[in-house]
Amino acid sequence: KDSQLQYVKRDFQKNIFNELSRVNCQYIIIDFFVDATQPLIKTNDNNYVSGNLHLRETKLLKCWKDIDFIRQVENEEYFIKWKEDLNIYMDNISKIVPLEKIILVKGRSAYAYKDKFGNRHNVKNPKLSIQQNYFWERMNNHFLKSYPRVKVIDMTEDFWIADFKHPFGASLVHYS
Protein backbone atom coordinates (compact mmCIF):
# COMPACT_ATOMS: atom_id res chain seq x y z
CA LYS A 1 0.00 0.00 0.00
CA ASP A 2 1.11 3.54 -0.68
CA SER A 3 0.37 4.65 2.90
CA GLN A 4 2.57 1.85 4.27
CA LEU A 5 5.37 2.79 1.87
CA GLN A 6 5.17 6.42 3.00
CA TYR A 7 5.32 5.34 6.64
CA VAL A 8 8.41 3.19 6.05
CA LYS A 9 10.05 5.89 3.94
CA ARG A 10 9.47 8.49 6.67
CA ASP A 11 11.04 6.16 9.24
CA PHE A 12 14.17 5.76 7.12
CA GLN A 13 14.50 9.40 6.13
CA LYS A 14 13.81 10.70 9.63
CA ASN A 15 12.03 13.72 8.12
CA ILE A 16 8.97 13.82 10.37
CA PHE A 17 10.14 17.07 11.97
CA ASN A 18 10.26 18.89 8.63
CA GLU A 19 6.79 17.61 7.81
CA LEU A 20 5.38 18.73 11.17
CA SER A 21 6.98 22.17 10.82
CA ARG A 22 5.46 22.59 7.38
CA VAL A 23 1.91 21.89 8.50
CA ASN A 24 2.14 24.33 11.41
CA CYS A 25 0.54 21.98 13.93
CA GLN A 26 -0.82 23.39 17.16
CA TYR A 27 -0.65 20.20 19.22
CA ILE A 28 1.22 16.93 19.00
CA ILE A 29 -0.32 13.75 20.38
CA ILE A 30 2.06 10.89 21.03
CA ASP A 31 2.02 7.45 22.55
CA PHE A 32 4.61 4.74 22.94
CA PHE A 33 2.62 1.82 21.55
CA VAL A 34 5.09 0.97 18.78
CA ASP A 35 8.04 1.66 21.07
CA ALA A 36 6.67 -0.70 23.72
CA THR A 37 5.48 -3.50 21.45
CA GLN A 38 7.57 -3.62 18.28
CA PRO A 39 11.26 -4.49 17.98
CA LEU A 40 13.93 -2.05 16.95
CA ILE A 41 15.91 -3.04 13.87
CA LYS A 42 19.62 -2.32 13.86
CA THR A 43 21.21 -2.45 10.42
CA ASN A 44 24.79 -3.51 9.76
CA ASP A 45 25.76 0.16 9.30
CA ASN A 46 24.41 1.00 12.80
CA ASN A 47 21.22 2.70 11.68
CA TYR A 48 17.98 2.04 13.51
CA VAL A 49 14.40 1.80 12.30
CA SER A 50 11.29 0.59 14.04
CA GLY A 51 10.31 -2.97 13.27
CA ASN A 52 6.70 -1.95 12.85
CA LEU A 53 4.05 -3.89 10.98
CA HIS A 54 4.31 -1.63 7.91
CA LEU A 55 7.97 -2.52 7.44
CA ARG A 56 7.46 -6.20 8.21
CA GLU A 57 4.83 -6.40 5.45
CA THR A 58 7.28 -5.19 2.79
CA LYS A 59 9.84 -7.20 0.84
CA LEU A 60 12.56 -4.82 2.02
CA LEU A 61 13.06 -6.62 5.31
CA LYS A 62 13.74 -9.91 3.54
CA CYS A 63 16.46 -8.26 1.41
CA TRP A 64 18.51 -7.02 4.36
CA LYS A 65 21.48 -8.98 5.53
CA ASP A 66 23.09 -8.79 8.96
CA ILE A 67 20.33 -7.04 10.83
CA ASP A 68 19.59 -7.38 14.51
CA PHE A 69 16.20 -7.24 16.13
CA ILE A 70 16.43 -5.57 19.51
CA ARG A 71 13.40 -6.45 21.60
CA GLN A 72 12.15 -4.57 24.63
CA VAL A 73 11.40 -7.39 27.01
CA GLU A 74 14.09 -7.65 29.68
CA ASN A 75 16.49 -5.68 27.51
CA GLU A 76 18.21 -2.70 29.06
CA GLU A 77 20.03 -1.99 25.76
CA TYR A 78 16.68 -1.19 24.14
CA PHE A 79 15.63 1.15 26.95
CA ILE A 80 18.96 3.02 26.90
CA LYS A 81 18.72 3.50 23.13
CA TRP A 82 15.07 4.55 23.46
CA LYS A 83 15.93 7.21 26.07
CA GLU A 84 18.70 8.62 23.85
CA ASP A 85 16.35 8.77 20.87
CA LEU A 86 13.57 10.25 22.99
CA ASN A 87 15.81 13.16 23.97
CA ILE A 88 16.67 13.85 20.32
CA TYR A 89 13.01 13.54 19.36
CA MET A 90 11.85 15.90 22.10
CA ASP A 91 14.57 18.45 21.30
CA ASN A 92 13.22 18.57 17.76
CA ILE A 93 9.53 18.46 18.66
CA SER A 94 9.87 21.24 21.23
CA LYS A 95 11.10 23.52 18.42
CA ILE A 96 7.79 22.92 16.65
CA VAL A 97 5.34 23.21 19.58
CA PRO A 98 5.87 24.11 23.23
CA LEU A 99 5.94 21.24 25.72
CA GLU A 100 2.55 22.31 27.08
CA LYS A 101 1.02 21.48 23.69
CA ILE A 102 2.38 17.95 23.59
CA ILE A 103 -0.12 15.33 24.75
CA LEU A 104 0.95 11.87 25.88
CA VAL A 105 -1.71 9.20 25.55
CA LYS A 106 -0.97 6.59 28.20
CA GLY A 107 -2.35 3.34 26.86
CA ARG A 108 -1.89 -0.36 27.36
CA SER A 109 -2.49 -3.64 25.63
CA ALA A 110 -5.80 -5.28 26.50
CA TYR A 111 -6.04 -8.63 28.25
CA ALA A 112 -9.30 -9.53 26.51
CA TYR A 113 -10.83 -8.94 23.10
CA LYS A 114 -14.08 -9.24 21.20
CA ASP A 115 -13.94 -11.42 18.11
CA LYS A 116 -15.74 -10.62 14.85
CA PHE A 117 -18.96 -12.01 16.34
CA GLY A 118 -18.71 -9.87 19.49
CA ASN A 119 -17.74 -12.77 21.76
CA ARG A 120 -15.28 -11.95 24.51
CA HIS A 121 -12.04 -13.94 24.83
CA ASN A 122 -8.96 -13.66 26.99
CA VAL A 123 -5.76 -13.09 25.04
CA LYS A 124 -3.86 -16.28 24.24
CA ASN A 125 -0.57 -14.98 25.64
CA PRO A 126 -1.32 -12.77 28.67
CA LYS A 127 2.36 -12.85 29.66
CA LEU A 128 3.22 -10.90 26.51
CA SER A 129 0.59 -8.24 27.31
CA ILE A 130 1.90 -8.01 30.87
CA GLN A 131 5.49 -7.57 29.66
CA GLN A 132 4.52 -5.00 27.04
CA ASN A 133 2.39 -3.06 29.50
CA TYR A 134 5.20 -3.04 32.06
CA PHE A 135 7.62 -1.67 29.48
CA TRP A 136 5.05 0.80 28.15
CA GLU A 137 4.43 2.11 31.68
CA ARG A 138 8.18 2.37 32.24
CA MET A 139 8.45 4.52 29.09
CA ASN A 140 5.50 6.69 30.14
CA ASN A 141 7.02 7.23 33.59
CA HIS A 142 10.43 8.15 32.20
CA PHE A 143 8.85 10.52 29.69
CA LEU A 144 6.71 12.29 32.30
CA LYS A 145 9.63 12.57 34.70
CA SER A 146 11.79 14.07 31.93
CA TYR A 147 9.07 16.32 30.47
CA PRO A 148 6.67 17.18 33.29
CA ARG A 149 5.04 20.07 31.40
CA VAL A 150 3.36 17.84 28.80
CA LYS A 151 -0.34 17.06 29.05
CA VAL A 152 -1.65 13.51 29.57
CA ILE A 153 -4.66 11.49 28.49
CA ASP A 154 -4.57 8.47 30.78
CA MET A 155 -6.27 5.39 29.35
CA THR A 156 -4.61 2.99 31.79
CA GLU A 157 -7.14 3.40 34.59
CA ASP A 158 -9.80 1.27 32.91
CA PHE A 159 -9.50 -2.28 31.64
CA TRP A 160 -10.31 -1.92 27.98
CA ILE A 161 -11.46 -4.74 25.74
CA ALA A 162 -9.87 -4.89 22.31
CA ASP A 163 -12.25 -5.02 19.37
CA PHE A 164 -11.12 -6.94 16.31
CA LYS A 165 -13.76 -5.18 14.20
CA HIS A 166 -12.10 -1.82 14.87
CA PRO A 167 -11.86 0.38 11.73
CA PHE A 168 -8.04 0.40 11.98
CA GLY A 169 -7.84 -3.38 12.22
CA ALA A 170 -7.21 -6.03 14.82
CA SER A 171 -4.90 -4.98 17.62
CA LEU A 172 -4.83 -5.26 21.39
CA VAL A 173 -4.84 -1.44 21.57
CA HIS A 174 -7.88 -0.88 19.35
CA TYR A 175 -10.54 -0.81 22.02
CA SER A 176 -14.31 -1.19 21.82
Model regions: which residues?
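Acidic carboxylate-rich catalytic motifs and surrounding loops in phosphoryl-/glycosyl-chemistry enzymes
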Residues: L104-R108, P148-H166
